[in-house]
């Protein structure tokens, strides 16, 4: 991979804060931190457009005693076999379960699947976390 050197102008105070943070995190140099920021910026933009393939997790907490939530969750998971790769089910207590659903597909479709899962009656909380599949990252 060819590297290109470029310069930027930013306020000194902003650079000082940035340097403190990247040192705390453990970056060896600014270039690595800037590369990660640019990658993250590109990935988030691709999610907004919705046409790029992403990977991620949909994590939900639900009360398995409430209505038909278990059946509806399973039905939805079977409806999206191409996008849902795997699931992890954890019993939190006598009534509450945590489910981590690993997904891969077009960003727009993954967001729609997450919305459908999180809006089911009985789901107490849900969160979608998306990342790149790594294919297009440099």
UniProtKB/Swiss-Prot annotation:
GO molecular function, one term: DNA-binding transcription factor activity
GO process annotations (BP): response to nickel cation
Positions of Ni(2+) binding: 78, 89, 91, 97
Coiled coil feature spans: none
SUPFAM superfamilies: ACT-like (SSF55021), Ribbon-helix-helix (SSF47598)
Keyword annotations: DNA-binding, Metal-binding, Nickel, Transcription, Transcription regulation
Family designation: Belongs to the transcriptional regulatory CopG/NikR family.
NCBIfam families: PRK00630.1 (NF001884), PRK01002.1 (NF002169), PRK02967.1 (NF002815), PRK04460.1 (NF003381)
HAMAP family found in the cross-reference section: NikR (MF_00476)
Function description: Transcriptional regulator.
Name the record gives this protein: Putative nickel-responsive regulator
